[in-house]
Amino acid sequence: MKDYSKIGDKLVMQRPRRRLEGTAMGATVFDLRPGVGIGPFSIGMPICEAFAQIEQQPNIYDVVHVKYYDEDPLKLDVVISFPDHGFHLRFDPWSQRLRLVEIFDVKRLQMRYATSMIGGPSTLATFVAVYALFGPTFPGIYDKERGIYSLFYPGLSFEFPIPNQYTDCCHDGEAALPLEFPDGTTPVTCRVSIYDNSSDKKVGVGKLMDRASVPPLPPGSLYMEEVHVKPGKELYFTVGGQHMPFGASPQDVWTELGRPCGIHPKQVDQMVIHSASDPRPKTTICGDYFYNYFTRGLDILFDGETHKVKKFVLHTNYPGHADFNSYIKCNFVISAGADAAEANRSGNKITPSTNWDQVKEILGECGPAAIQTQGSTSNPFGSTYVYGYQNVAFEVMKNGHIATITLFQS
């Protein structure tokens, strides 16, 4: 992932500062869409689409932080943060889809709802202003421990800090907040949350934040389509119903999966030096070539002489790997044993969520790992480890999660 460097559990997008001298930070106006999103970012969008939006407008998004939990990337959200604009995007770690927009510094973000402005340095998002713009709603919830009052609309919530001297205006739990305090002041929004409004969940600060979930995918969506793997035989795509066997021709692949996103020649296999049975001279480029299906999390390798499929590479797209944001996550399922139904019942299946210790419990121990590294300049995340079984090789990150799976015929 060329455009990022790693600082702790944070990726920082590296690009020169492009903001023109004298340009106001608040000059950019983001459309506020309750239940839908903010600006170009929509609830439910894949993380790769969010990055595409960022790359298309580098003058606006010139400081971007990507935060994740390095030890267990499935435990916490992947967060894209825009510190200059005061908001961040929270992505569900499993589906890698946007579940929540959090505006944590409302004074930094100029928002437009319908034809009216709110937020930013010149338009305070006070309780009175919010009520006037969005209209009446049900009583909110007061969190006495945090001193925060949350006001809810469909797919949208506002948080207001309550000064200590006025906490008696609120009661813990559901409560109505007066438009003004006794001294004539009105509370000012400290945080805005935007989330899917297909359910009646109230999303706010603290534990309420965890209630935000991604909306269901439309029927027939290929995103996160389950791909069933029969090691040494084929891939089966469960939504489209395509079977992709080893030995298929490029024409077969085009017919079943469509035009590839990219085609490129394969570099010499660095692992072939360990094979005593391959006496061919080693060159930088071999005749083999890849079809890249980035939107499926899949690479297909063809033999340069026979033009038949010889390998499949499946990507998990975890942060902390050099290929992060190059592929959409491939939702593969590898069943241990011949009977897939029995594997489902027993739990003996390998998916992108399966860690390396669990793989060994299912498949048994294997030989020592080969270390794969690209150097700190091109890959700030360090080495990965490649373990081989019959017809399958696992590339494993230092945290024990699978980065890629390579399928071949022994």
UniProtKB/Swiss-Prot annotation:
InterPro entries: PHAF1, PHAF1/BROMI. Transmembrane segments: none annotated. It comes from the Eukaryota. Belongs to the PHAF1 family. This is PHAF1 protein At3g51130. It comes from Arabidopsis thaliana. The lineage of its organism: Eukaryota, Viridiplantae, Streptophyta, Embryophyta, Tracheophyta.
